């Protein structure tokens, strides 16, 4: 299990690297959806929920974990692609989602051009 100080440190790092919202609009003004491509209880799921909980407390808004498993990460990735790029749908993922388009030509997205990474949460 990941210790609380590590999660807090990683969350602080994530907040430091997050872009500042432009204009007078308050962010977040509604719950943030956190897409997770693995089933509940997996390492990616646990990390996503811990980071979401800490960010929710700091930002004063809830993070809703949305597990979209299957399709070798494609179900979650397609949900992210279809979502507006407004910062209210985020995805926590493993390197698998970024490698899929290079392994299967049927996947029509570019992980470098189509997505904006926010933070590196954990390394092994």
Can you describe what each PLM-predicted range is?
Residues 1-13:
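Bacterial N-terminal signal peptides that target proteins for export
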Residues 17-21:
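N-terminal signal peptide c-region/cleavage motif recognized by signal peptidases
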Residues 23-116:
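N-terminal (or domain-start) structured segment
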Residues 116-124:
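A conserved helix-loop-strand patch within extracytoplasmic ligand-binding domains
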